[in-house]
């Protein structure tokens, strides 16, 4: 026998031996977490914060299982969304970018066997998830996402699977992110990537891995919602996998923050909840005779994690990190000179909306800003602002997008916005409801109550121009734009740069479609800049300017002006607002 053939034969025997179990019984536990969203610490990082689920509480739970089952019989995996979405990851993602990122160190401390990249992890941006993946690799933990493919070579950007040995048992863990990622976030977050549907990809990968690696147990971890199992929703393919996969023992899902367990024949599926409040556990019993698995039993359950029972040794190990994060979160970033009242936006140009427009204008040299309210009926009080207050000032994770729109398209956009906002009224005006409201049953009281006919999340106003909105005119002729904020001419056939949010850029509210941009390709072709989160913009605005002053953010030479006409309109709309929310 030639040397090469001999070596190959020996290698084959070794591989065969590695895949063959000794006769007997094997008991393993698969512990699954997910959707932690950066709730890492057991104690609050904000002043006045409450105790809640945490990674440290989950660590105590995992420690208990390892003590009872034996550490080598426990597999710890995570379904993603771990380093984006709260104050602690913000600090390590965007403020302290020179130290080692905290999440890989936490995952290493807890001895995770594999972690999936969730949609929010991708939303953090290339700089963040590339850095985290690199540091996790150094810690010996794979960040998996087998359906995130590189445009450059068509191969997975992150590993598709990992092989783990536990108690002599060979376990394959295949990991996938959400197939709808491209539609769930700004394109700059996932530049150079495309996302494949989990069907039929996962089954194809399972078949390849089973053939190549010959595992005894196969686990699929997918950051996808459960869904209905009808195969219709890319974002919700959990039950699709559960119903269709063959040769898989455990399916772990996430994304929708549900707590669900289902089983059928030889497969179980678990959806592990959110923010450290739950963990899924699957006990697997294998009986081996003659080197083959002759019996396989699966028992899956969901367990609530007690927030007060956390890993104190882990807390002590990461105390310096906690102190740094808490110092940042509770530190003063700026001041609001005068309280901002959101409900004023319904009937007039308001300080609150001027502030939102000013943020966009401060971040990029745009001609026009288009934005809706973030607070339906709220107040931003005057006074000192700490970082922990930024979420109250700007409660959503929108990002800035700048695109090119013609004057005619901006006019159509505003017409569509105000058509969702107001009715056309005719004389007599005294009792007219100018705001689009309706009466319907309030299920909390059982009584009839006034409600908005449309969502105010789509009531966009504009800054950078001067215009009026005539409530006596029909749709298509209400908005009259007189000129730009600086007094220059507004032209219908001229292209302007306009600031919008990522919420609007993906077609939400239908305003871009009403403006004439029929599909996402039309929108993508017009985009000239993709900016950071507005919370980051707000943080930077405070660091640069020190305060939000209505006299500054409301400068008419910058934000322009707008109003409802005729004269009765603002008071009539205000009366409608009081029907909704009281005086």
Model-flagged regions — what are they?
Residues 9-10, 228:
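Intrinsically disordered, low-complexity segments enriched in polar/charged small residues
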Residues 11-19:
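Hydrophobic h-region of N-terminal signal peptides that target proteins for export
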């Amino acid at each position: 026998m030639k040397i090469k053939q001999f070596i190959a034969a020996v290698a084959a025997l070794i591989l065969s031996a590695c895949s063959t179990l000794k006769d007997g019984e094997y008991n393993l536990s698969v512990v699954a977490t997910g959707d932690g969203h950066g709730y890492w610490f057991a104690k609050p990082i904000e002043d006045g914060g409450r105790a809640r689920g945490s990674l440290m509480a989950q660590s105590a739970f995992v420690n208990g299982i390892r003590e009872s089952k034996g550490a080598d019989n426990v597999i710890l995996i995570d379904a993603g969304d771990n380093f984006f979405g709260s104050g602690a990851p913000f600090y390590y993602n965007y403020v302290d970018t020179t130290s080692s990122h905290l999440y890989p160190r936490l995952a290493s401390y807890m001895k995770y066997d594999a972690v999936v990249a969730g949609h929010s992890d991708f939303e953090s941006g290339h700089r963040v998830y590339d850095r985290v993946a690199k540091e996790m690799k150094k810690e010996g933990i794979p960040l998996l996402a087998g359906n995130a493919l590189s445009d450059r070579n068509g191969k997975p950007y992150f590993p598709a699977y990992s092989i783990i040995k536990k108690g002599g048992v060979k376990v394959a863990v295949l990991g996938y992110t959400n197939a709808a990622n491209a539609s769930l976030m700004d394109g700059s977050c996932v530049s150079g990537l495309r996302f494949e549907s989990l069907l039929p990809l996962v089954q194809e990968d399972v078949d390849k891995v089973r053939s190549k690696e010959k595992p005894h147990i196969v686990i699929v971890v997918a950051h996808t919602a459960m869904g209905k199992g009808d195969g219709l929703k890319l974002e919700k393919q959990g039950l699709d996998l559960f119903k269709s996969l063959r040769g898989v023992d455990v399916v772990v899902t996430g994304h929708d923050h549900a707590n669900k367990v289902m089983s059928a024949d030889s497969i179980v599926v678990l959806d592990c909840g959110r923010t450290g409040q739950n963990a899924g556990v699957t006990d697997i019993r294998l009986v081996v005779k003659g080197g083959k698995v002759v019996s396989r039993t699966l028992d899956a359950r969901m367990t609530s994690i007690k927030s007060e029972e956390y890993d104190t040794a882990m807390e002590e190990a990461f105390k310096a990190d906690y102190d740094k994060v808490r110092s940042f979160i509770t530190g003063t970033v700026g001041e609001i000179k005068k309280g901002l009242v959101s409900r004023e936006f319904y009937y007039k140009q308001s300080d609150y909306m001027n502030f939102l427009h000013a943020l966009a204008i401060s971040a990029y040299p745009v001609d026009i800003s288009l934005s809706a309210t973030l607070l339906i009926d709220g107040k931003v009080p005057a006074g000192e602002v700490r970082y922990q207050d930024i979420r109250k000032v700007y409660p959503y994770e929108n990002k800035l997008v700048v695109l090119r729109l013609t004057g005619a398209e901006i006019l159509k956009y505003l017409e569509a916005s105000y058509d969702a906002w107001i009715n056309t009224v005719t004389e007599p005006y005294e009792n007219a409801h100018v705001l689009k409201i309706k009466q319907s049953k309030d299920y909390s009281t059982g009584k009839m109550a006034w409600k908005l006919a449309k969502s105010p999340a789509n009531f966009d106003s504009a800054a950078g121009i001067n215009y009026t909105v005539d409530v006596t005119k029909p749709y298509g002729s209400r908005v009259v734009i007189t000129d730009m904020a600086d007094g220059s001419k507004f032209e219908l056939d001229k292209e302007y740069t306009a600031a919008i949010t990522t919420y609007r850029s993906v077609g939400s509210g239908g305003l871009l479609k009403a403006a004439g941009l029929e599909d996402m390709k039309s929108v993508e072709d017009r985009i000239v800049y993709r900016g950071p989160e507005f919370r980051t913009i707000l943080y930077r605005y405070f660091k640069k300017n020190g305060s939000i002053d209505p006299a500054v953010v409301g400068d008419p030479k910058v934000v322009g002006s707008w109003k409802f006409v005729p004269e009765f309109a603002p008071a009539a709309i205000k009366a409608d607002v009081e029907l909704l929310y009281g005086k």
